[in-house]
C-alpha cells in the first residue's frame, strides 16, 4: 500500500515538473517576444521606419511649368508645351529573356525608334541601376500609346519643352533652353530663375509594382512667373525682315538692328541676321546663337562725331557758324584726310560731309580727359545694365594723355570698342535732347529714372546738323523718309584682322532718330563686312534705316513732320 502511494506521488511530481517546464518555456518565449516587440516598436522603431520608407517612400522633384515670355502687347514669344519622358527601371523587369519575342516590347522599340537589341542592352546593362531614360520630350499621344502597352518597369514623366512662335525673328534675343528646361541663351538664360520659380519636392509612396499609392506632401515650391518684354512683335518682325534682306543683298557676314522708344528707354526690337530656328536646332550654326547686339564690340567710326561737336560747342571751342580748314594734314607722317576733298567747312558741313579732318582738328583743341569723358558721359564703353547675360563692356583708352594722332583718330571712332547697344543708347540720349534714361528689355509704363547729362540747346543744334546728312545728294540721303524729318549719322569703319592690323573689310553703320522735330524712336543699323561693290554706311546701312523707320512710323501712327518733303 505504501509502495503504491509512493509511486503515485512520484508520478504527480513528474507530471508537475513537466507542466512547470512547459509553462516556463512558454513564459520565456512570451518574455522574449515581448522584449522583441518592445525593441522593434520602441527602441529600434526609427531605424525600421527608415528601412520601410527607403523601400516605399520616394522624394520626387516637382518642376514648375516654365513661365511664358510675351511681347508688350501679350503676344507669346516663348511658351511651354506639355511632353513626356520615358524611362525604365530594369530591377522591375522580371522576364528579361522573353523581351525579344514580346510583341509589346517590340511596339515600344518601334514607337521610340530604338532598336530592340539596344533596348535589351539598356535593361541588362547594370542590375543596380533603377533609372534609365529611353526618350525625352515625346508628344503626349505617343506617351498615351506607351502607357497603354502596360509594360513592367516602363514609366512616363510629365515634362515640358519650349516652343517659339516667332521662330528666327527674335531667336538670339529670346534664346533657348536645354532638354532639362534650363535657359542656356538669351532672355531664357538671363531670367531663368524668374521664369522657373523654385522647384518643389513631393513625398510619394510606391507599391511593389512601382505605382504611386500615396502623395504625402509638397515642400519648398514657389510658382514660375510670366515675363512681359518691351519688345513689340510687329516691330521686331519688320526690323528682322528688312535687316535680313540687307544682309543677303550685300553678302554680308551679319547684321544688327536695334529700335528704341526714346521717351521710355524701352527696346522695341533687337534683331540679328543670320538667325536660326529655335524650334529645330538640327541645322543650327553655333556662331548664330550669340546676340551680337550685346556680346560683340566694334570701333564705331564716324557715328561718334556728333559727341565731339556737342562737347566743343558746350566748351566754347567752336560756334555753330565756325569755319574749319579741312585740307588734309599730317600728324607725324600720318595723313589725316577725307573721302572727298573740301578746302573748308562749317560745323554743319563737317557732320554732313563726315569730315575726319574737320572733327579731328576740333578734337585736338581739347585735352585728353575732356574728350574721353565726353564719350563716357554718353555711355560709350559703359555697360547698359540691361540684365542680359553676356553683355560686354567695351573699351576706352585709359591713358591720361593721348598723342595727337591718337586723339585725332579717336574723334572719328578709332581706338575704342563699343557694343551696338551702346551706340543705340548714344542716339537715344541724343533723341531725348541730352536726357539719359536707362534702357529696358522689360515693359515699363514710365522711365525708371531720368538724368540730364548734356545741355538741351547744344544737342538740338547738333540734331539740326544731323538732319542735313540725309538731304538729297548727301552721303546719307538713302536714309531719308518721304514726309518725315530724320536726323542720322552714317559711318564706315575698317575691321581689324587676326594679327591686329587693319584689313580691307568694313563695317557699315547708320544710326539716327525720327521724327527729328519731336524724336520718338532711335534706330541703329550695323552691317558687317558687305562683300558687294558698296561698303560705305551711306550706301549699305542707310537704305535699311529708311525702310525700317518708314514702316515703324506708319505702324505707330506718327504724323509726318515734313509736309514740304511730302508734297514734293
From Swiss-Prot:
Where does it primarily localize?
membrane
Q: Which UniProt keywords apply?
A: Carboxypeptidase, Cell cycle, Cell division, Cell inner membrane, Cell membrane, Cell shape, Cell wall biogenesis/degradation, Hydrolase, Membrane, Peptidoglycan synthesis, Protease, Septation, Transmembrane, Transmembrane helix
Its EC number is 3.4.16.4
Is Transmembrane helix set as a keyword in this record?
Answer: yes
* Top-level class of the enzyme under EC nomenclature: hydrolase
Task: Locate the transmembrane regions by residue number.
Answer: 19-39
Q: Name one GO molecular function term.
A: peptidoglycan glycosyltransferase activity
Q: How does it sit in the membrane?
A: Single-pass membrane protein
Compartments in which it is found: Cell inner membrane
Q: Name one GO cellular component term.
A: plasma membrane
Q: Which InterPro entries is this protein grouped with?
A: Bact_Transpept/Beta-Lactamase, Beta-lactam/transpept-like, FtsI_transpept, PBP_dimer, PBP_dimer_sf, PCN-bd_Tpept
Annotated catalytic residues: 302 (acyl-ester intermediate)
Listed under catalytic activity are:
Preferential cleavage: (Ac)2-L-Lys-D-Ala-|-D-Ala. Also transpeptidation of peptidyl-alanyl moieties that are N-acyl substituents of D-alanine
One GO term of the biological process aspect: proteolysis
- What is known about what this protein does? Catalyzes cross-linking of the peptidoglycan cell wall at the division septum.
| Protein's UniProt name | Peptidoglycan D,D-transpeptidase FtsI
What organism, scientifically named, is this protein from?
A: Buchnera aphidicola subsp. Schizaphis graminum (strain Sg)
